[in-house]
């Protein structure tokens, strides 16, 4: 019997026999494999697409659309659908490019956690970006040109955002061209107000994205980029006068108070909760859009506030960052 002793710590006998319990344990342990693309869980796809931010995309579309005079409801629905595909495709592409980084630092993300293969994510992103850009391009020549510029910014940001210090500008460019694409689909097209609105939204996104970079690359938080979060308030005061200025000031107060509430978690809390701040500021994009159309009838506000609340609710189930 001594010649058939158990090898210490291994549970396998020296004569090569495997104990029955160990055999069942080995048989019951499946090999770790990536599920096929069509088998990826719905939650995996929702997390990859960061769908909790989609209400902010629809809000951008509505703001640009209204600034250009609106138009047929069917065109607006088509616009939102195309923008949705581009956004989700861009988020998929972001994870595909970041797979190596996530494997080292964020193993809970879908690709390093084996919830879906990197190859499948590449395929999803290509299909979504192509489909969304095509849908936006169908809205007209100007829309097609702007949609291609939007696509270029999305791809450049996803490919280089880890290596470029000024990548927040690329992220801001994505929202800039989204608003202009939405305006180009309206009856009046892109005008000066739509251009300025897209620009100040871009400033807000630069400040937001600067903070988001600190979430994955901790370091000293500088205050000056956060000043850009106030850019929409300045434009609202300049372009609205009389009765509309009162509405703009009210909307500005809402935006400002929300931004301060979000920043409190990072600037006046130890340790800083940067993710919480960024998520709140992302939802606040809907309030910035509301500020851009302060001269619209009161019932229009309901749609932007609805997008804001929906974004916050979705963040309870799917991370925004």
Which residue ranges define each predicted feature?
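A cross-taxon signal for low-complexity, glycine/charged-rich
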Residues: 9-11, 27
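C-terminal membrane-associated helical module and adjoining short loops/tails
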Residues: 24-26, 35-46, 126, 176-321
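Residue-level signature of transmembrane alpha-helical entry/exit and packing/kink sites
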Residues: 44, 53, 57, 75-79, ...
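Short, amphipathic, aromatic/basic-enriched membrane-interface segments that mark the entry/exit
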Residues: 44-52, 95, 111-121, 139-140, ...
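Membrane-embedded alpha-helical segments that form the functional core of polytopic membrane enzymes
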Residues: 58-97, 129-137, 144-157, 196-207
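Multi-pass membrane catalytic core of lipid/isoprenoid biosynthesis enzymes
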Residues: 81-82, 99-154, 169-172, 178-180, ...
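Acidic (Asp/Glu-rich) catalytic motifs at the cytosolic membrane interface
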Residues: 83-113, 120, 208-219, 318-319
């Amino acid at each position: 019997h001594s010649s058939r002793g158990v090898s210490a710590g291994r549970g396998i006998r020296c004569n090569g026999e495997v104990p029955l319990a160990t055999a069942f344990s080995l048989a019951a342990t499946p090999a770790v494999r990536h599920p096929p693309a069509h088998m990826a869980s719905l939650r995996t796809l929702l997390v990859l697409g960061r769908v909790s931010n989609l209400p902010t995309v629809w809000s951008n579309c509505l703001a640009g659309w209204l600034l250009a005079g609106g138009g047929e409801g069917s065109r607006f629905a088509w616009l939102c659908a195309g923008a949705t595909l581009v956004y989700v495709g861009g988020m998929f592409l972001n994870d595909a490019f970041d797979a190596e980084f996530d494997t080292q630092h964020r193993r809970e993300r879908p690709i390093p956690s084996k919830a879906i293969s990197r190859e499948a994510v590449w395929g999803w992103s290509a299909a979504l970006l192509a489909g969304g850009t095509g849908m936006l391009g169908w809205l007209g020549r100007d829309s097609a040109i702007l949609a291609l510029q939007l696509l270029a910014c999305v791809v450049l940001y996803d490919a280089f955002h880890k290596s470029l210090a000024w990548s927040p500008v690329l992220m801001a460019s994505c929202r800039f061209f989204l608003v202009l694409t939405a305006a180009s689909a309206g009856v009046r097209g892109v005008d000066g107000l739509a251009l300025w609105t897209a620009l100040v939204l871009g400033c807000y996104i630069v400040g937001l994205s600067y903070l988001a970079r600190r979430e994955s690359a901790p370091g000293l938080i500088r205050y000056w980029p956060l000043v850009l979060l106030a850019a929409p308030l300045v434009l609202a005061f300049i372009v609205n006068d009389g009765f509309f200025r009162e509405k703009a000031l009210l909307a500005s107060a809402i935006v400002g108070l929300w931004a301060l509430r979000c920043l409190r978690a990072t600037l006046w809390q130890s340790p800083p909760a940067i993710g919480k701040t960024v998520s709140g500021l992302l939802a606040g994009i809907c309030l910035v859009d509301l500020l851009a159309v302060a001269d619209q009838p009161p019932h229009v506000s309901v749609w932007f506030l609805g997008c804001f609340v929906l974004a916050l609710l979705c963040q309870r189930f799917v991370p925004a960052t």
